[in-house]
């Protein structure tokens, strides 16, 4: 039997409204609350190597920039991912994250 998974894209899609400037505290709060609500997949933003790292934004230049977001979070149940718009993030910017 197939199961339905729920994906939340607030931190990526919502960024079109505020240039992905949610603030680190809000980013942490959104991720934590989504995980507590049982959301299966949390899209934490965009990967775009043309953008400089800014902890207050959910648009990141590489996967290593994701780590600081989780320094105060303990996410156990949700799959965490980011979207890449074709041509904006080279494969060398991607590393496996846990």
What is each PLM-predicted segment?
Residues 1-19, 75-79:
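N-terminal small/glycine-rich loop or linker at the start of catalytic domains
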Residues 15-22, 54-57:
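A short N-terminal beta->alpha junction/helix N-cap motif
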Residues 19-29, 91:
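Glycine-rich anion/phosphate-binding loops
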Residues 35, 41, 46-98:
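Active-site beta->alpha loop and helix N-cap motifs at the rims of alpha/beta catalytic domains
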């Amino acid at each position: 039997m197939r199961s339905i998974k729920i994906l939340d894209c607030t931190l990526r899609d919502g960024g079109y409204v505020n240039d992905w400037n949610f603030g680190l505290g809000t980013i942490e709060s959104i991720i934590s609350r989504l995980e507590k609500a049982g959301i299966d997949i949390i899209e934490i933003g965009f990967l775009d190597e043309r953008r400089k790292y800014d902890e207050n934004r959910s648009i990141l230049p590489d996967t290593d920039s994701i780590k600081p977001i989780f320094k105060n979070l303990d996410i156990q149940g949700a799959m965490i991912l980011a979207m890449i718009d074709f041509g904006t993030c080279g494969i060398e910017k991607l590393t496996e994250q846990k």
